[in-house]
Amino acid sequence: MDLGLTGRTAIVCASSRGLGRACAEALAAEGVAVVINGRDADRLAATAEAIRAASGATVTAVAADLCSEDGRARLLAACPAPDILINNNGGPPPGRFEDWDHAAWLAGLEANLLAPVMMIRAVIGGMRERRFGRIVNITSAMVKAPHSLMGLSTAARSALTAVCKGLSREVAADNVTINNLLPERIDTDRQRFMAEARAAMGGITVEAAYAEIAQSIAAGRLGRPEELAAACAYLCSAQASFVSGQNLSIDGGSYPGVF
């Protein structure tokens, strides 16, 4: 299927590795000029070169911390009028409610609510004027199925979901869509961190922890980053112009609810 994306431009946040990188790769394969971002300049440069080699696409790398105004400004200077914005950022680590102080809450909200909101605010006006825009937020399965250990992440990402739901209704008539991808148990560095924590708590090997995690997934395995990226590319496509304000779970069928 031709997704109708050739010649479009995209900003993909936090894309030097993991889910962000997979989304950048998927968009580049569709002929999108991508601007990738991360805080590790060396890793980012290597990722940019790999995507160029694989796709032939134009890839611009901007090392910046998107939790700062200066970082966001530098990223937007490299692509001031994107057709596509993929919001992505690492979540805060799991923990206990009683251990999260005021600073921890502010840091979680800055990374997973305010940074993506400020990115959307910067680009959505131009998208509406040009009558094309695709915004995809990579949030978390915890938005629909909260867990006490993931409270910091859940609170911030749920707030982002609520903000974007209202905004999506306002901009839909201008051919601007806003959707959210809700991953769970995707085989990334963050999942390895979770497996290592599980192993340490349970006194088992990391391999055994991975096996336990796989058993908890309806599909019986961890997801692959490229599986989420394929869904992301579709939501950015011309064909997805009537899909907006939605939360798409990428979780191997594990979510037990109806809605």
What are these regions (language model features)?
Residues 125, 169-170, 241:
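Alpha-helical segment proximal to the catalytic Tyr-Lys
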